[in-house]
């Protein structure tokens, strides 16, 4: 995957993240100096933060210095995060929330940049591919079978909902199963408002892909009054056709 990423993407990431850390920390004099990038063929992404003697303008917060080498890493001088003493459960929850924040940010941003129709097309396909690729590993991590009928896939969806801090339930028959997923936190707006239909459509691609890996003879659809996710989602797993 790295071979397909242009170096401009790395620069954009550094500009949007590392260059803004000084401002986020309340220190407008702090900038980032990038010395190496893997997308340019270097052996690592390397750089260091430099505190200047004056506040930096936005275009000064990131500088590239490919003729320099970053300082050697000294573990003894590195700060120790408070999470080093956290119990495993708290650490796992923090990692989960951190990962979920990426998706909560990315989906609305895709709509803002691409527009709803193109975002649903581009991101929906990407989500489907992620579901296809990682379904087996997810089942293994959850201790669930990766094959079976509608009931088995519904059980997977419920486990994923609970892993995200939500509650979900199953109803129906062996052939047609409905998963009630009240108010997915991952999709809600920052103010708790229900997600836009386009965001639900992109997110659904993840489960369409997972279902394709589980059983190509089954389909997933949204049904009932919960179609707009105001009261949560109702996901139906049933035979195709």
Where are each of the predicted segments found?
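Short amphipathic alpha-helical segments
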Residues: 17-22, 207-208
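N-terminal accessory segment detector
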Residues: 2-13, 27-44, 50-241
